[in-house]
Amino acid sequence: MYRTALRPSQSALRAIRSTTSPSALVSSGARRFASTTSAPKKKSTWKGAAVRWGLAVAAVYYYNTSPIFSDELPETAGTAPSQLTDADLPTVDAIVEEKRRQAAEHAAARKAAQAAAKAAATPATPSESVEEQITKAEAEAEAVPEGDSKPRSESTEGVIPEAGASPEALQEEADAQGAFNPETGEINWDCPCLGGMAHGPCGEEFKAAFSCFVYSTEEPKGMDCIEKFSHMQDCFRKYPEVYGAELADDEEAERASAAAPAAEGTPAKEEPVENKKEEALEPATHDATAANNNKKQQ
């Protein structure tokens, strides 16, 4: 029974050995490629070698320069912030002190602005009283020698007139100090010879009356300006705290003019019209000369 089973297996092994032997493989290969011929080998040229070397160099260069194959991360645009210490950080006390300092500065600036506004709004007041002006005038008159015939306007040229000066004296001082330009007809209201009266509460009335007197062509001078001087005096009475000295001069002039007719035995109502007109011509800054005349009459 076993012999009949081994015989077919031995015949199969022999067939496999015969097909896998080297001689069988060579013969089978010869039979398979008998109709074909081997392809001839092509000779390489220098152009192909140059192309191959160029491609190799380009690949190496791209590998070394491309960021794709780089191991390091690219640098960021911004730099890292520096480390802060505790000394650099502001404390609560420092912040409170800074706020207090700023508040004090704002308060000081506000007070300075208010003081400047008050100073600008306060009108200019005469710096000297009538008594001081009269005393100065008498001292100057005594200082001048008797034989000196030089006019007073020339000896006091360039000096600011007193607050009690008459319109004629103001005009002379204005002409001497260049406040009035006769060629152009302009009046410099900022001239110190006017005593700052053009910038007070009644500055407009003073400008109107003084300019009318300067440009007046009537005889006696200023006869056509009586109404304007009356308006100016009415304005002075509204501000007695500013023009108190000028109002006192006007009252003294009125008392002197009223006492003169009584001393002569004539009634006060018969006072000449010219005296009344001269009284109306007295501006805000006059009249020291009237006070001197009153003393001489007494």
UniProtKB/Swiss-Prot annotation:
Cu(2+) or Zn(2+). It is a single-pass type II membrane protein. InterPro entries: CHCH, CHCHD4. GO terms for cellular component: mitochondrial inner membrane; mitochondrial intermembrane space. Pfam families: CHCH. It is found in: Mitochondrion inner membrane. Its cofactor is Cu(2+); Zn(2+). A motif (Cx9C motif 2) lies at residues 225-235. Monomer. Required for the import and folding of small cysteine-containing proteins (small Tim) in the mitochondrial intermembrane space (IMS). Forms a redox cycle with ERV1 that involves a disulfide relay system. Precursor proteins to be imported into the IMS are translocated in their reduced form into the mitochondria. The oxidized form of MIA40 forms a transient intermolecular disulfide bridge with the reduced precursor protein, resulting in oxidation of the precursor protein that now contains an intramolecular disulfide bond and is able to undergo folding in the IMS. This is Mitochondrial intermembrane space import and assembly protein 40. It comes from Neurospora crassa (strain ATCC 24698 / 74-OR23-1A / CBS 708.71 / DSM 1257 / FGSC 987). The gene is mia-40.
